[in-house]
UniProtKB/Swiss-Prot annotation:
GO molecular function terms listed in the Swiss-Prot or TrEMBL record: metal ion binding
Species whose genome carries this gene: Arabidopsis thaliana (Mouse-ear cress)
SUPFAM superfamilies membership: HMA, heavy metal-associated domain (SSF55008)
Family: Belongs to the HIPP family.
Lipid attachment site numbers (S-farnesyl cysteine): 163
UniProt entry tagged with the keyword Metal-binding: yes
Official protein name in the record: Heavy metal-associated isoprenylated plant protein 45
Phylogenetic lineage: Eukaryota, Viridiplantae, Streptophyta, Embryophyta, Tracheophyta
């Protein structure tokens, strides 16, 4: 583990937390994965949650070595694909909650007012202070298009003289 003391050029590995998503079905799978990870040098703790398919390894280990060792057990494994925030701990109990939360954030930042605003392409202004960067027309520059009233009623079902192609 501390080869750098004996003249090896490798730098020491810092204390790290490695989170993996591992396909485990039973206690036997859990035991096999725990035993394989425990054989690695520098592992302090191994926490396995079979319900969430999550393995958390704490210690002075390289995350690539941990992933390789878990894959050698025959289980499919990948890095935990959901965010970890140390302040909240395991904020997302299950992976599907992360997806639901991210969808809600998108819907909260993009609001729909219920009416369509018409504007000219040349009248955009740059607003970099919004949560979604892009070009938005200012409220004074919005223009209603010129649409003939007869053209709107041409294909109406209420009009007896309407186009009969449809």
């Amino acid at each position: 583990m501390f080869d750098w003391i004996h003249g090896n050029s490798r730098l020491p590995i810092a204390l790290s937390i490695v989170e993996l998503l591992v396909d485990m079905d039973c206690k036997g799978c859990e035991k096999k994965v725990r035993r394989a990870i425990s054989k690695l040098d520098g592992v302090d703790t191994v926490e396995i949650d079979v319900d969430r398919q999550k393995v958390t390894v704490t210690g002075y280990v390289d995350r690539e070595e941990v992933l390789k060792m878990v894959k050698r057990t025959g289980r499919t494994a990948e890095y935990w694909p959901f965010p970890y925030n140390g302040y909240y701990g395991d904020y997302y109990t299950y992976p599907s909650q992360h997806l639901e939360q991210s969808d809600q954030k998108i819907y909260q930042t993009i609001s729909y007012s219920g009416k369509y605003d018409f504007y000219d392409v040349d009248d955009f202004q740059n607003t970099n202070n919004s949560t979604i960067n892009g070009y938005y027309p200012s409220s004074s520059q919005k223009v209603q298009p010129n649409i003939d009233e007869n053209a709107l009623h041409l294909f109406s079902d209420d009009n007896a003289h309407a186009c009969t192609i449809m």
